[in-house]
Amino acid sequence: MSIRLPHSIDRSASKKQSHLSSPIASWLSSLSSLGDSTPERTSPSHHRQPSDTSETTAGLVQRCVIIQKDQHGFGFTVSGDRIVLVQSVRPGGAAMKAGVKEGDRIIKVNGTMVTNSSHLEVVKLIKSGAYAALTLLGSSPPSVGVSGLQQNPSVAGVLRVNPIIPPPPPPPPLPPPQHITGPKPLQDPEVQKHATQILWNMLRQEEEELQDILPPCGETSQRTCEGRLSVDSQEADSGLDSGTERFPSISESLMNRNSVLSDPGLDSPQTSPVILARVAQHHRRQGSDAALLPLNHQGIDQSPKPLIIGPEEDYDPGYFNNESDIIFQDLEKLKSHPAYLVVFLRYILSQADPGPLLFYLCSEVYQQTNPKDSRSLGKDIWNIFLEKNAPLRVKIPEMLQAEIDLRLRNNEDPRNVLCEAQEAVMLEIQEQINDYRSKRTLGLGSLYGENDLLGLDGDPLRERQMAEKQLAALGDILSKYEEDRSAPMDFAVNTFMSHAGIRLRESRSSCTAEKTQSAPDKDKWLPFFPKTKKQSSNSKKEKDALEDKKRNPILRYIGKPKSSSQSIKPGNVRNIIQHFENSHQYDVPEPGTQRLSTGSFPEDLLESDSSRSEIRLGRSGSLKGREEMKRSRKAENVPRPRSDVDMDAAAEAARLHQSASSSASSLSTRSLENPTPPFTPKMGRRSIESPNLGFCTDVILPHLLEDDLGQLSDLEPEPEVQNWQHTVGKDVVANLTQREIDRQEVINELFVTEASHLRTLRVLDLIFYQRMRKENLMPREELARLFPNLPELIEIHNSWCEAMKKLREEGPIIRDISDPMLARFDGPAREELQQVAAQFCSYQSVALELIRTKQRKESRFQLFMQEAESHPQCRRLQLRDLIVSEMQRLTKYPLLLENIIKHTEGGTSEHEKLCRARDQCREILKFVNEAVKQTENRHRLEGYQKRLDATALERASNPLAAEFKSLDLTTRKMIHEGPLTWRISKDKTLDLQVLLLEDLVVLLQRQEERLLLKCHSKTAVGSSDSKQTFSPVLKLNAVLIRSVATDKRAFFIICTSELGPPQIYELVALTSSDKNIWMELLEEAVQNATKHPGAAPIPIHPSPPGSQEPAYQGSTSSRVEINDSEVYHTEKEPKKLPEGPGPEQRVQDKQLIAQGEPVQEEDEEELRTLPRAPPSLDGENRGIRTRDPVLLALTGPLLMEGLADAALEDVENLRHLILWSLLPGHTVKTQAAGEPEDDLTPTPSVVSITSHPWDPGSPGQAPTISDSTRLARPEGSQPEGEDVAVSSLAHLPPRTRSSGVWDSPELDRNPAAEAASTEPAASYKVVRKVSLLPGGGVGAAKVAGSNAIPDSGQSESELSEVEGGAQATGNCFYVSMPAGPLDSSTEPTGTPPSPSQCHSLPAWPTEPQPYRGVRGGQCSSLVRRDVDVIFHTIEQLTIKLHRLKDMELAHRELLKSLGGESSGGTTPVGSFHTEAARWTDYSLSPPAKEALASDSQNGQEQGSCPEEGSDIALEDSATDTAVSPGP
């Protein structure tokens, strides 16, 4: 049976009927007797898309249903692979309500074809969310006898009525409709009764709305409508049939509408919005504002030929598609259509990078704005889009970016450059437009609100109004971004829309309860928007808020819930249906209520006037208990795409305030993956769910005590003083120079920012730390890592803020700021600040990672973080932003002080103090940075140790790796780490994670989550059977680092050890720069490990803190009083040369150090048994070699350079022991201050080693070289006629770098020590042999005590005669023992030399009075002691040279092996003569080179005897010395 509609209803307002699978369908079937038998006509033509049609093939119909999961799940089961069928359907379940039947074949799930998918894949797709969109193929459902209504599951429509307007031309007549029936309804009388009641209420509401619309109509029309709509109350009470019979148009409209909104099976969207949109546009409505008026506000069209669209009638989508296609073709057309642009912006913000489009739009506004107003906009465009760290940075050519930057800095107009930048991003924008067009062709345009554009018809007014409505949905999308991105996006959209003239209509006034609730929160919404400042009075706040609303169209939607329709979260089915069902309680609905479009639901679902926070429906499948269903939702729900509508938004606020036992899965999956706190506006919008969720302190922080709330009130942000001049009077500023004004500005900035930083620390304490501690949200250990010493840090900054306030109270002008700065950053205050700050900052990265983990795993902690970070005192900053404020503050201090120094007059005491304070700030920052780095490295080492697997190493037999079977990485300090590739052979490589520790290199192999310590082997060179095993752990004191000549990314680590043959590791970095970093750090670590082989040196007599030298007897001690402890004492060397101090400063330091405590004596046997590290030859340690010879116990494997260093040190110590009485400073009488002293050193070789141009006694320029009596000789110079071999050691550096490359000569003695000591000159005799006299003979000159030492009055010619002249080619000395003892007590009668004297005097200790010679046997004990020292040194030197010989032989074997293989395919076989020779030249010291050459000539000879090895190091002339050791 069919229903004939009256002629007053326009055909164009009708739509296809949705699927009726509820008790409503049962009730509708009873209406079959209401109409006459006039048949409706349908169009025979139909052109439907596959997803929209009902395909009938062999009795089967393809349809689409959308199922919403309820508390029992989806309510059906599936079976089969490839052909997946519905096996069973639960009666009354979600699937049955949606129209799923047993035996239906599933074609698509959520748009994905499943015809080739397995059973498990289909089930997984269906369970991927709370909604499932299924395309089914099955038998056609039974029909109901209602004509004009089509029950197609894929189509849901609502009959629309229009105001009375001139109708368009009628369409052609339609053929009779076909009748398609739906599934049988549920037989529930209560449900039918309830549905009938709802329809009656809707009918009354329609009458009232029509009466409101009728007055503007003509009198005749009004009488006609009243005649049709006058309903007798008695007739209404008698039953619905009579009312429906008299008013068929209204009843059918209600049937259409209620079939969608009241059907319990339609809690989820079961319709395709694309179909609704296109059907609605089949015949465009003329002259009606359909986009603004909801259904119940529109009148009835007086069209003379109303027709309803038949069930099989299709529509012509050409007009709308063509119009939209034209607009969506390029950006120029979009800019002129704001509504279409907002739809495109919704797509961009959901699916693409919004930066290029927003940059283009803002630049467009800039182009059309006058230069005065566009100046600030240009800076905003730079900060948002073009700066290096801009939140929405776009990629434009660097030249354009630099030009824009330059013009903005110079206050020039960058319009032309911005035009070019727009063209640069236009290509990417066009690609985004094409992407959107492709999605439109797939029917996805409705997801972004394109349905709302159907009735615009090119009307600019309606288009502008539609754009205003679309901005609401845009605001919801923006609210899901993080704050640092959402605020710039909001600003950019607001800028263009304001320029385009888009304004929002004033929303209707809310109810009293809403006003009362929203009033206290007004101020809390304002900080969400940029450049909104707090004002002092409430009137100003309200005025600014109103201005913001006018400027920012989005503010009306995201500010606070002004009206019920605006407070609805779009897309929430529960709210929409509940909203509609309770609408009858409002007697007079307002016609201006706006409709919000979600893009994924039919428009009519959203048309309502009010909202209620309760659910009172009790029908089958209703939303009763929906909150419990959502709370119990399991965590397997996968996150929906950002383009999808958030179905759970309205229930989110309730979930935020659940108990601690709520399931973690109830949280939004998106919030778990991206722990961004909700904004204040977003929290406010949720207040529609619970009236008590207003954004106030007692709700957000329910557990804070009253005193805490009082402290929070003290934390209100103070008004930021932008300009110091605004805080003082103009008369004060008028009397100051511009430089002083700038200085006061910087000082004021320091004060204000320090107070702001203190507020930030208090926020951390009150809102986070105190609550976490009171509520036991974190264990004490974790809390101690996150806030280790926060109260101490607050106290430090608070004390300084108080001091600054007192300083400010003294007057508006701060005259001298240096003393407070020094008081804060120097002395004990500096130590306290750097220690507390380092402790606070060290574990921040570890603690923040812990917080992220807890947020993912613990729902209670996640809720707390959301609440706390949403507090207004946090100023939209998250915990991770607040906790790093201390580190950021430390970096600001040097910059602020530098600016103050810049505006402070130089040369004043204040300037010097400020410079010192700045330097101390940098030291504090450096200290904290190092502490943070070490803590992070230690944390990473702990992680590596947990994953370390050394089982393979425990089973290995490699002796090198035996001691590392129980390796503990946490006991060492990590220097560097990173991935490297190990080329084991030509065809085998291995990816490694390499750790560089302070004494080890660890090669870790990744295997899943484990890190393996595993030995690897390869075939040895020259043998096909034997294999060489490589240890994964290398000691740094036994390795060499070399670069690979044929690969700029590779380097060698060569391990030399007594436990096995040399091993070569070829490691390849990712880039050449990485390789350089690795080599630099490795060489430095090798050098440090070589200085301290094995374990750290054990100091025999530890010096007091701060001392750099052993404590001496003071200025009264003489050289005769030297004891064993002084001879053998070693000290901890400095890491590097002190910067800045010259000779004078060094001498002063030594004089101060020399006043320390006496050094205790030790037995010589004990000294011989303890290992020694060679003292540094740098800086201050060079001058004590006569008193600090090194005893190195060769107990472990040593690097070759270490042996060479030690041997050379012994050579120097031996020379000084022999010749100490002849060195400068032991004169017969005291020299006058400032008088230059002649060089008394008898040999050129000694001069060349012990003097340098930068010594105090040598001014640095070359003296007259008429003979060899001068102390100073320029580096590298040599007397004429002198044999090079004689002084071969004279020009050798005392040590080498670990890389094997020899540096320029370094200081061999410490001038400061030389200037602070006293020395007798007659302890024993030294006989010099002159090998060649001027006449050609050989003679000898005996020097005995001080009588043979020439004084300063002797001429150079006399000295030349004694020493054999300048042509002497070599000298040799031997010791002649004195006959009697030497008096060891001399009393001082003078004062130490003045600093000026130190420049001219030699740096050796000087005697304050003339030496009084003593005869006899008084010096026998000293001589015997010195002889023992000499021979002990010679013995140690012999051992070291033997070891050096062995190292040289091992090195030669290593070079031979390198020549025999190509190093994993990178080093050619024939490259030994180049690379090996280069290594030989750079790695061997000159004495070792001579030994190597000698060994090469002798063939298989094992090496020279100890005497020969000693002679190599000691030989200074052509004649053997008398001090050469015996066997």
Swiss-Prot record:
It holds the Pfam family PDZ. Residues 1-56, 216-247, 506-569, 582-687, 1090-1184, 1231-1321, 1379-1411, 1480-1527 are annotated as: Disordered. Residues 1508-1518 have a biased composition (Acidic residues). Residues 973-1087 form the PH domain. It is found in: Cytoplasm; Membrane. Residues 461-487 form a coiled coil. Keywords: Coiled coil, Cytoplasm, GTPase activation, Guanine-nucleotide releasing factor, Membrane, Phosphoprotein, Ubl conjugation. May play a role in the regulation of RhoA GTPase by guanine nucleotide-binding alpha-12 (GNA12) and alpha-13 (GNA13). Acts as guanine nucleotide exchange factor (GEF) for RhoA GTPase and may act as GTPase-activating protein (GAP) for GNA12 and GNA13. Involved in neurotrophin-induced neurite outgrowth. Interacts with RHOA, GNA13 and SLC1A6. Interacts with GNA12, PLXNB1 and PLXNB2. Interacts (via DH domain) with GCSAM (via C-terminus). Found in a complex with ARHGEF11 and ARHGEF12; binding to ARHGEF11 and ARHGEF12 enhances CDC42 GEF activity of PLEKHG4B, and PLEKHG4B, in turn, inhibits ARHGEF11- and ARHGEF12-mediated RHOA activation. This is Rho guanine nucleotide exchange factor 11.
